[in-house]
């Protein structure tokens, strides 16, 4: 019932947008008027059966012929023939037929609710709070319907755009270069080398050529004396000419230094690999557009086009070639697919424009040689020119992208309906009243419902399942039958896509039914084999149906056969569910997952990339930061070592601001290349940022090469500068952790710490005051450790209280909960007698400073001791100066440690310390 309700509401929302643009009988309130006329007529049949259902399946889905045109207009008025999957009979309608009905009062309430809103098809900024556009539909679904049930969160456009462009465009460039390496290199890398600042984002360029004030410039020399004192002014807010919102001079200078480094590498011609565009965070969208528009080599242009759009067969012996395939395996309401469409559309347009210009130049020059070279160009230009107006051509190009480039799967049926609806609305938004609406695409075979993690994904898995691991050739005939049917699937699937984008072409209900029937038979057969692997007695129909309903298997190898048979998808993007496996295990189980111990569905989705991504493809996912830091994901990190040839990670905190509103998730964005490479992995720092920084958050990302990992399971560092890399290497010189020798199970040398650090870590030799009706200790937050001696306690607690350890906790740790294991993992040398005496003195001074700078606060019914960390920071700095000598840090490295994230940690008083 929920599913069919979503189907009907999706159709009605689509029609509501149409009537707002006068596409329904030129009436902006077409549906309301038809409902009122029905109610006034006091008909015995419901509005749904008498008018709405016929409108769906006859008015919008029946092709106009001389015999039907007049009758359709007489019954429904002037309404467009839309075709497409939205108004084809849904599987629920085929299953239940006449039994489906909806009461009139449901439509009265729904239409009244719709009438309260302003409906817009464009992407204007929303002002009134009562406006609805296609983006809002996705937000509403993810925010209020899907989030709590499925661990899915609405992904904002800046995230989808960053991930999308850095996976889709590198995949395209890689495919074109593979076909024409010499021609590509001769065009691409000189363009980049001589581009100046064209591909450096404006945020990175802000103030880069402005002269620094003398007191700021005084801190640039890292070799001179008193570096920390000379750099003290760097904690002041930078001036507006030089800075981005909220920047202090320390951040502004780091950004400027990075920009100058990029400029130098560009000018020297050092950046000449597709991955460099990601590593140095260049404007990859503008680069590829300029690359295409500056190309005069028709062979290279055709390569761009056919790798983008696919190649329709021109002769009977030719095979259909698919375009760049972009998959979101957990697509939700389609946020990433929408972003992919917006990324691909300008590339289609640029390639068409450039082909048209190059062809015109050839004709003007009288070039009649090699007619076959131009034949396909002439045909594709004619196909899109036949659309007529610019808007109609935009419609044709957008439709082509939706049909030939975008694919999605989701376990939530309603999500896939919303995703398809948003793509349909994107098409209609291109038109104006009076335009003819070309038939909508049918993308029921592009956007699919099912469980990404349950089902056969490869030929080997499918063959093994059908033949049986121990049954010899008993099922060989069955496997051969499947292979024969898959050949038919490929032909039907390809024809289904081809027919939709050829001018005047359309897909009949019979075409769709034939493909659906073939797929259904294959799915039924594979479900039978898979259920047996799960121990289900398939002879008991009820048990079999319950298993199918709970597991919702999706057989990638069959359902996307033409793509999977060719090796997989070119670009995989998405935001997989962050759900602990234990919470869904009673509903469904996953099998064949090597990372099962990781215990979270997002981990299994990452492992699934190994079969979904073709060789030399790219993927981009946003996942919890735990992937790179906790022991539970050791096996996943090991798998990633084999999965990715190159990897680009960026990391984001939840304080002061978070990427997902209302969701407490520290996040990592993974951009990965699935092919052989030099194995270079790159990482950013752990970003703690303010909301004012969001507009430039992704355009000013700075990545550095990740230091060599100690093992495949080692934590992934979260660092963003060479200074941090040097500090990390100095720490790693010491294999042993002193805490392993200095801690014991019980003693009088107790230290206390808060398990969830905010902007600093306090390790104390006294229990902070806490009083509430529940007790005299904050049992949920305060943890304790015991040391072997006073000196041992001072060393462990002093190190734990330092800014050096605070940085290390975020660079290597889980960024959330501080544990004994985190302390045991910190490498350091043992102190000699003089060092032990000094650390005891420094620790006593720090404890005195904490006590002197504390007060008792009351919140609700609890009273607690609050510490002024800013006032105590000089004592913390003294601790860091001590450990800087221990680890042989340079003044530049010590300056970084003492001032690590200083703006976030101390706020507006940063300039005073």
Predicted segments, located by residue:
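Short, hydrophobic/amphipathic alpha-helical patches that form generic packing surfaces
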Residues: 10-19, 53-58, 142-143, 421-428, ...
């Amino acid at each position: 019932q929920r599913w069919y309700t979503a189907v009907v509401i999706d159709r009605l929302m689509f029609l509501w947008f149409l009537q707002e643009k006068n596409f329904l009988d030129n009436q902006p309130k077409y549906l309301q008027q038809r409902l009122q006329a029905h109610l006034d007529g006091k008909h015995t049949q419901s509005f749904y059966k008498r008018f709405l259902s016929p409108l769906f399946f006859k008015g919008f889905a029946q092709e106009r012929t001389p015999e039907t045109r007049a009758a359709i207009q007489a019954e429904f008025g002037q309404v467009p023939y839309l075709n497409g999957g939205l108004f084809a009979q849904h599987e629920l309608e085929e299953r239940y037929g006449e039994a489906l009905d909806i009461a009139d009062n449901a439509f009265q309430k729904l239409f009244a609710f719709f009438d309260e809103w302003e409906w817009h098809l464009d992407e204007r900024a929303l002002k009134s709070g009562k406006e609805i556009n296609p983006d809002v539909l996705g937000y509403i679904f993810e925010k209020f319907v899907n989030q709590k049930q499925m661990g899915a969160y609405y992904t904002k456009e800046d995230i989808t755009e960053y991930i999308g462009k850095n996976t889709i465009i590198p995949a395209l460039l890689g495919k074109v270069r593979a076909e024409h390496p010499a021609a590509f290199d001769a065009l691409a890398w000189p363009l980049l080398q001589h581009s100046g600042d064209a591909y450096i984002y404006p945020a990175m360029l802000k103030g880069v050529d402005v002269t620094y004030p003398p007191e700021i410039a005084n801190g640039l020399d890292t070799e001179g004396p008193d570096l920390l004192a000379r750099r003290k002014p760097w904690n002041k807010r930078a001036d507006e000419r030089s800075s981005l919102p909220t920047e202090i001079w320390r951040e502004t200078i780091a950004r400027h230094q990075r920009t100058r480094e990029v400029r130098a590498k560009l000018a020297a011609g050092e950046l000449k690999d597709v991955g460099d565009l990601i590593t140095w965070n260049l404007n990859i969208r503008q680069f590829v557009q300029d690359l295409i528009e500056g190309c005069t080599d028709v062979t290279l242009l055709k390569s761009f086009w056919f790798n983008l759009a696919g190649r329709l067969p021109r002769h009977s012996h030719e095979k259909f070639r698919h375009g760049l395939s972009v998959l979101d395996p957990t697509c939700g309401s389609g946020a990433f697919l929408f972003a992919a469409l917006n990324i691909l559309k300008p590339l289609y347009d640029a390639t068409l424009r450039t082909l048209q210009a190059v062809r015109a130049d050839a004709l003007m020059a009288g070039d009649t040689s090699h007619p076959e070279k131009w034949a396909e160009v002439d045909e594709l230009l004619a196909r899109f020119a036949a659309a007529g107006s610019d808007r109609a051509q935009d419609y044709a190009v957008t439709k082509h992208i939706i049909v030939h480039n975008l694919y999605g799967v989701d376990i939530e049926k309603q999500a896939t309906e919303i995703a398809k609806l948003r793509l349909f609305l994107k098409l209609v938004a291109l038109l104006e009243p009076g335009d003819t609406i070309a038939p909508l695409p049918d993308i029921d075979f592009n956007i699919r419902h099912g469980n990404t993690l349950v089902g056969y994904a490869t030929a080997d898995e499918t063959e093994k399942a059908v033949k049986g691991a121990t049954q010899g050739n008993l099922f060989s005939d069955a496997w051969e039958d499947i292979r024969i049917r898959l050949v038919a699937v490929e032909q039907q699937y390809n024809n289904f896509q081809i027919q939709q984008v050829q001018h005047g072409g359309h897909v009949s209900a019979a075409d769709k039914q034939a493909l659906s029937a073939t797929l259904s038979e294959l799915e039924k057969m594979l479900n039978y084999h898979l259920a047996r692997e799960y121990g289900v007695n398939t002879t008991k129909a009820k048990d079999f149906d319950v298993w199918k309903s709970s597991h919702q298997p999706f057989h990638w190898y069959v359902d996307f056969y033409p793509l999977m048979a060719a090796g997989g998808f070119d670009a995989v993007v998405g935001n997989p569910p962050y759900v602990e496996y234990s919470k869904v295990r009673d509903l469904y189980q996953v099998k064949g997952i090597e990372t099962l111990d990781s215990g979270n569905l997002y981990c299994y989705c990452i492992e699934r990339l190994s079969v979904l991504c073709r060789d030399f493809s790219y993927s981009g996912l946003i996942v919890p930061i735990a992937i790179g830091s906790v022991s539970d994901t050791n096996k996943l990190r090991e798998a990633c070592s084999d999965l990715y040839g190159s990897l680009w990670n960026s990391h984001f905190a939840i304080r002061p601001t978070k990427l997902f509103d209302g969701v407490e998730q520290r996040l990592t964005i993974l951009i990965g290349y699935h092919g052989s490479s030099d194995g270079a992995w790159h990482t950013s720092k752990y970003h703690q940022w303010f909301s004012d920084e969001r507009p430039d958050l992704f355009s000013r990302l700075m990545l550095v090469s990740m230091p060599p990992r100690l093992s495949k399971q080692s934590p992934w560092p979260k660092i963003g500068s060479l200074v941090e890399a040097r500090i990390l290497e100095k720490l790693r010189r010491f294999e042993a952790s002193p805490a392993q020798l200095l801690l014991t199970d019980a003693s009088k040398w107790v230290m206390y710490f808060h398990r969830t650090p905010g902007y600093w870590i306090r390790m104390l030799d006294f229990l902070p005051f806490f009083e509430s009706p529940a007790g005299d200790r904050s049992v949920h937050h305060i943890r304790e450790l015991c040391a072997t001696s006073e000196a041992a306690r001072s060393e462990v607690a002093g190190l734990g209280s330092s800014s050096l350890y605070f940085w290390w906790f975020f660079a290597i740790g889980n960024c959330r909960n501080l544990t004994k294991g985190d302390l045991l993992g910190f490498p350091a040398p043992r102190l000699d007698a003089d060092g032990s005496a000094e650390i005891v003195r420094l620790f006593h001074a720090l404890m005195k400073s904490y006590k002197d700078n504390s007060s008792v606060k009351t919140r609700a019914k609890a009273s607690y001791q609050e510490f002024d960390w800013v006032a105590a920071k000089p004592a913390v700095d003294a601790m860091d100066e001590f450990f800087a000598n221990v680890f042989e840090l340079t003044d530049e490295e010590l300056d970084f440690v003492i001032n690590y994230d200083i703006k976030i940690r101390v706020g507006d008083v940063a300039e005073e310390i």
